[in-house]
């Protein structure tokens, strides 16, 4: 791809981004990202979060999902969050910066969870996209498999899992895997998710 094509594509993305009504609303409300609205839509339909819950947030930065969940679980709730990128502090959120794919980071995250009964694991993780689906989709699927492994390790019986997945090779198999672990599984495409994006959200409840 030439520099001119990249520049044109980047300009289109920026124009679309800043004219996006959810981006504008997020800025007006002082929210960290438009992802806040995606989780709000999911909460309205699936009622995942309740006061006092313990929640694990994977791929947390810049903090849109954690910021939303704090409003739902209240002061007695707890969020353990992790991301490769830094994240400004949020009251009620225990943040660990590190690469979730690293075993030492995974171990540190599990230590922070400790004996807590985790009611929700949520993952908005995504790899750095190259624009080539044959490269991007396997990278993304690896991350969502790791998120599901976290569910196996820490999620309490009856707990819930919400994960961003990019449709493509491996999606159907992953969905079957989740259905074997949860009693109810839905695939959501929030209105606040860009229409041309491959992303969908799998919402799984009732950990077996």
Swiss-Prot record:
Its EC number is 2.1.1.166. It catalyses: uridine(2552) in 23S rRNA + S-adenosyl-L-methionine = 2'-O-methyluridine(2552) in 23S rRNA + S-adenosyl-L-homocysteine + H(+). It is an enzyme of class 2 (transferase). The keyword Plastid does not apply. GO terms for molecular function: rRNA (uridine-2'-O-)-methyltransferase activity. S-adenosyl-L-methionine binds at residues 63, 65, 83, 99, 124. One of its GO terms (cellular component) is cytoplasm. Pfam families: FtsJ. It is found in: Cytoplasm. CDD domains: AdoMet_MTases. Its main location: cytoplasm. The active site is at 164 (proton acceptor). InterPro entries: RNA_methyltr_RlmE, RNA_MeTrfase_FtsJ_dom, rRNA-MeTfrase_E, rRNA_MeTrfase_gammaproteobac, SAM-dependent_MTases_sf. Keywords: Cytoplasm, Methyltransferase, rRNA processing, S-adenosyl-L-methionine, Transferase. The keyword rRNA processing applies. PANTHER family: RIBOSOMAL RNA METHYLTRANSFERASE (PTHR10920), RRNA METHYLTRANSFERASE 2, MITOCHONDRIAL (PTHR10920:SF18). Specifically methylates the uridine in position 2552 of 23S rRNA at the 2'-O position of the ribose in the fully assembled 50S ribosomal subunit. Belongs to the class I-like SAM-binding methyltransferase superfamily. RNA methyltransferase RlmE family. This is Ribosomal RNA large subunit methyltransferase E. The lineage of its organism: Bacteria, Pseudomonadati, Pseudomonadota, Gammaproteobacteria, Enterobacterales.
């Amino acid at each position: 791809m030439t520099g001119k094509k990249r520049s044109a594509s980047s300009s289109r993305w920026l124009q679309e981004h800043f004219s996006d009504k959810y981006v504008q609303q997020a800025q007006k409300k002082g929210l960290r990202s438009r992802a806040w609205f995606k989780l709000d839509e999911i909460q309205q339909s699936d009622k995942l979060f309740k006061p006092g819950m313990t929640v694990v947030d994977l791929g947390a930065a810049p903090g849109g999902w954690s910021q939303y969940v704090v409003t739902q679980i209240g002061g007695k709730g707890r969020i353990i969050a992790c991301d490769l990128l830094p994240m400004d502090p949020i009251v009620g959120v225990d943040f660990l910066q590190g690469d979730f794919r690293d075993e030492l980071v995974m171990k540190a995250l599990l230590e922070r969870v400790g004996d807590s009964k985790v009611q929700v694991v949520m993952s908005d993780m995504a790899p750095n996209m190259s624009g080539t689906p044959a490269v991007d989709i396997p990278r993304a699927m690896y991350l969502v498999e790791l998120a599901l492994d976290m569910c196996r390790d820490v999620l309490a019986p009856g707990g819930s899992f919400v994960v961003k997945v990019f449709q493509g090779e491996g999606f159907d198999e992953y969905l079957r895997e989740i259905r074997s672990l949860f009693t109810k599984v839905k695939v959501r495409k929030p209105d606040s998710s860009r229409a041309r994006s491959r992303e969908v959200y799998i919402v799984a409840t009732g950990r077996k």
